[in-house]
Amino acid sequence: VGVPRTVYIAGAGIAGLTLALALAKFGLHVVVLERNASASEFGAGLQISANARKVLDNLGLSEAVAEKSFTPEGIDIFPDGREKPLQTLTLGKTIETRFGAPYAVMHRADLLEALHAAARRFANIDIVFSVTDFALESSGSALTVKALEPDGKTRKAKPFAFVGADGVRSVTRTRYLGGPEARYTGEVAWRALVAPETLSGMLDLSRTSLLLNSRFHMVVYPLPHRNAVNLALFTQEKERDLPVLDQRAPRIKPGKDRRLAHILDSVDEGWTPWVLSSVQTPNWHRDAIGLIGDAAHAMLPFQAQGAAMSIEDAAVLAPLLAASPSAEHAFSRFAALRQERVKRVQEVSASNGKIFHMGFPFSLARNAVIRSEGPEGHFKRLDWLYGYDAIQSGKS
């Protein structure tokens, strides 16, 4: 038996740790470089659809995810301050039966902790925290990695491959692959957690709620094991205002919308703004260096698929890096398998944002379509998304 291949990964986020686990299961040695002092994740809620859940289950995380997540029975859609839902989309057991895994919501930090705990159980995964910088030298299959560790020492290695899972502001993409800087989308996500009792009588907390308005939209869902409800409010903001976002609350006037006014009043701890940027680049790899997740294809969250695409990426790339004759061959095959799908998800996400924010009279047509599709119409429309098998794709 030869020496196992070594793969270096930049970033101990959801993309990086999922890939580390997937590679470790194939027997590869994995080193994860993380600039933070611990595995940490910004944000609050996270939606895990069936296409991502199947990957996590395959990595042995079924129990950990089930323990910390919640499965909504459906999605209540409230356009323009309606008292009752225009439509309730079916989720729950129906979606699990159709796609082979449930649709769940959970706190991002809980998923990251589950991934980190699983990674710690593998002797062939090393996670190096507080890495201040790294340098790559690449020519063909020859690759040298130098990582500056917190004690001032430099870790030097010649791995089989280097994967940038270093997020929307990826150094791997911009410094080593000639990729673009992330582009501001014009949208900001404002996140908050509130106590469930503050929304009593306002929303059905057995379901997710989607509030639509021409100036914003809001997604609300419970995180029961944290005794909290996740609020994600999306507004359009001018780029010149971004530096002062954290000094103010979102500028939303509820008007006659009693429900919205109550939700806004329930936020005691304040809102945390998150500027939404996107990445579109055809350059996912060069030689033995490649990208996954937001580093390659950050997208608007309006189909709730950013994390899911990162998780899919890991499932597809791992077997390719394990079996391909060269890292370049693995990355090339990975791009061929993933780029078209990811582009489609990016386009659907952007389109959803426009649909959510439609003003009168276009909102009338939107509402008519939502009503006519019925509670299960979204299944057929999204079969291609939720029914995808990333594990099988990586074997092709």
Located regions from the model:
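Conserved N-terminal helical subregion
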Residues: 2-7, 24, 49-195, 238-247, ...
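FAD/FMN-dependent oxidoreductases across multiple families
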Residues: 202, 214-216, 224-226, 233-303, ...
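Conserved mid-domain beta->alpha element of the FAD-binding
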Residues: 8-25, 29-36, 163-164, 220, ...
